[in-house]
Amino acid sequence: MQHRRVPVHSLGISQIVSFGLLFYAFAQLKAPLAQSAGVSETTILAAVSGALVIQGMLALVIGRWIDRFGGLRIMQGGFLIGALGLGLLSLYPSFVWICACLGLIGVSYAMCTYEVAFGSAVQLDEPKARRNISIITFYGGVGSTVTWLSVAPMLEFFGLQLTCLGLAVLMLMGAWRFWVLGRHYQQEAPHSSLALEPFRWSILTQTEKWALVTMGSISTLGYLTFTATSMFWINLFSEKFADPALAVVLASLYGPFQVVGRWVEMKFGHRFDARLSGVVATLLMPLALTMIHSDAVEVAVLAMILFGMGQGVLTVTYGFVTNLYFRAAVYGRAKGMMIAPRAVIAALGPSLGGLLYAQGADPFLYVMTGLMLGAMLLMASLLRLPPTNEIHLQPSNS
């Protein structure tokens, strides 16, 4: 197998931009968009949820494209579509128009976020997939912080229209970067359409089926919690401490500590089974959610640190543990099978979170805690399922 140098830094920076502009930004864009369209913020969040469903609808197709054409080409198209969606969003004449723009943004989200970036890393250098995925997510960890600390002043000084146009320009720059990378790497299809290795449910082994269902369930619970909480941290802390500025700081804490978690994974994770790291990560998150019930600012700070570190390691787990059971030749389609139901259910996060949060912060946190406890138990069950990818059977690679 030919191994090529993975453009981990470009892939990592792309995740700051794509997650930040296609998801995190709507925590702050939702209010001015709702005001301009004459609808409630909950309605805008429902539209965002609908856009995220598109990832599930396209997951199987995009997974096949990753295996056939390579992840870098897919990301180029995703950034271009995202630039178009955000650019058109600046016009915001009506709620219907906003929904149409969010449709484009949903397609872009499906084509240029972690799963496609992970596919590129696995295809280019499978033996070093865990380290490369860790580096990619290391960058992505600051996406929420960079976005929330940037979008607020942009909205204040430039208004909604110019802010959306500015975000569109950043997406266009990302499309250009992946066009350059595609030419540099000359990333031909790993297999032609006729030689693409067969991959369908009926030919999977029992171990592969269990791994696929379990990882799909874990990531579904994790992303449902992630999408629900991301939209309401600022609201929750604003109400709890009656200080909007403090709320933004607290909400922004978990981004840098995702980076800390991923740094720990990069430096020390290779000493441990990636599945065990996943168990620890999923345990940190319900612990953090429980601590947030406290009225002490210091406890809230510690909780967001733990939540961020858990989320940081867990993202690496999603990307790499899949590769323990599925080789590079079928990785894209395996992820596609996992993402399809996950994306549809996780897309309900903003709207489900809105409904739960309307009942109060405590019920909201109880439900999120329960979801992550379920994810932790499922992750622990994978420890009894031996890896099947021969490349990672050596302890140093798992």
Where are these regions (language model features)?
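Extracytoplasmic gate region of multi-pass secondary transporters
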Residues: 26-30, 208-265
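Extracytoplasmic
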Residues: 6-41, 58-62, 148, 227-234
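A late C-terminal transmembrane helix in Major Facilitator Superfamily
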Residues: 144, 328-361
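Intracellular juxtamembrane helix-capping segments at the cytosolic ends
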Residues: 111-125, 313-326
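C-terminal transmembrane helical hairpin of 12-TM major facilitator-type secondary transporters
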Residues: 254, 258, 272-321
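Conserved MFS/SLC helix-loop-helix module at the cytosolic interface between two early adjacent transmembrane helices
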Residues: 57-95
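Helix-to-loop junctions at the C-terminal end of transmembrane segments
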Residues: 58-70, 261-273, 357
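Helix-loop-helix hairpin linking two adjacent transmembrane segments in secondary transporters
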Residues: 136-186
